[in-house]
Amino acid sequence: MNPIVINRLQRKLGYTFQQQELLLQALTHRSASSKHNERLEFLGDSILSFVIANELYRRFPRVDEGDMSRMRATLVRGNTLAEMAREFDLGECLRLGPGELKSGGFRRESILADTVEALIGGIFLDSDIHTIERLILAWYHSRLEEISPGDKQKDPKTRLQEYLQGRHLPLPSYLVVQVRGEAHDQEFTIHCQVSGLNEPVIGTGSSRRKAEQAAAEQALKQLELE
């Protein structure tokens, strides 16, 4: 891999790996090698959830568990992680197999999000919990400053349903129109039909649930509720 690209990524992350093989593994999708990033992703997912939960607990001493859970879900969900990946220009660093390269896997939100979690796992193994906690909080600084408890933190499907129910309109319908990829790495495409919108709204995700949430979020934007 191009060392210039790797060094640029490490500068954006604010961390230089001592064990460069951990960085390369974190950037490797299972389509490219048997030594891929899924175990690191598993580890990073748990670390991210802990760090964000701990920070929310510290910042919001009077907020109940339900609101904190919703805020955490907003901060660690796939599209937030994919946004962060794009801020790091992570797409140009991914190691993908020929099929994923051809299908534009370097742009796919699920792959970008998973790679951020794998990087978190890799940095933890390369350093310690205090280092990765400091980095995560730095990456999330603006998002943590902006987030607040309340209805805004409900997931998109819930907010869309409550909006329609409040106006006595039919509930949205979700239809799977395409499933791509192998069983371990699928991408679902959903059409969501919503009263008040002329065309179905499209959402994609690595599971049906995530695709439905993505479609609901697009519907909320079209209804100008986002």
UniProtKB/Swiss-Prot annotation:
- In terms of domain of life, where is this protein from? Bacteria
Q: Cofactor(s) for this protein?
A: Mg(2+)
Domain DRBM: from-to ranges: 155-225
One GO cellular component term noted in the UniProt record for this chain: cytoplasm
Q: Which reaction does it catalyse?
A: Endonucleolytic cleavage to 5'-phosphomonoester
Positions with a binding annotation for Mg(2+): 41, 114, 117
- What family does the database annotate? Belongs to the ribonuclease III family.
Task: Describe its assembly.
Answer: Homodimer.
Protein name according to UniProt: Ribonuclease 3
Source species of the chain? Yersinia enterocolitica serotype O:8 / biotype 1B (strain NCTC 13174 / 8081)
Q: What is the lineage of its organism?
A: Bacteria, Pseudomonadati, Pseudomonadota, Gammaproteobacteria, Enterobacterales
